[in-house]
């Protein structure tokens, strides 16, 4: 069991994990992965066991002009449906906490769709709190 930076060879596994989260399939995933992997303010991580990717997480660091520390945002986080409740999500979350502390972030944020009740319970157990209000303006 290991956590490592994703490579482009992980694209198909990540596409399958995104599909489990109800994201539509897209031919752009590999290209977007390359963009993320070349961004110094982002990490694309995978959890691998016996040569199989069974979880992934995208972490983005956001610089803050008004505060000393940056903040970290979990943009995507998925564990294979067949591998849930085995500590994989916890291992990935603990790994990003270490990255955020190393970067001197003052918080980690995560946006999680309201229909993902099991994910909410996971985040609450890890110490996350609901902090309203999150406003979104579609632009495309």
Regions found by a protein language model. Give the residues of each.
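Residue-level recognition of the GNAT/N-acetyltransferase active site
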Residues: 62, 80, 84, 113
């Amino acid at each position: 069991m290991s956590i490592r930076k994703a490579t482009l060879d992980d694209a198909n596994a990540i596409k399958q994990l995104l599909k489990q989260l109800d994201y539509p399939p897209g031919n752009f995933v590999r290209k977007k992965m390359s963009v993320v992997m070349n961004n110094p303010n982002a990490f694309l991580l995978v959890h691998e066991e016996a040569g199989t990717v069974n979880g992934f997480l995208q972490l983005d660091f956001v610089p803050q002009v008004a505060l000393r520390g940056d903040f970290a945002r979990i943009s995507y986080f998925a564990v294979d449906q067949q591998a849930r409740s085995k500590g994989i999500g916890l291992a990935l979350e603990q790994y990003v906490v270490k990255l955020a502390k190393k970067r001197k972030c003052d918080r980690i944020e995560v946006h999680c769709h309201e229909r993902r009740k099991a994910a909410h319970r996971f985040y609450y157990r890890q110490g996350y709190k609901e902090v309203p209000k999150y406003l979104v303006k579609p632009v495309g």
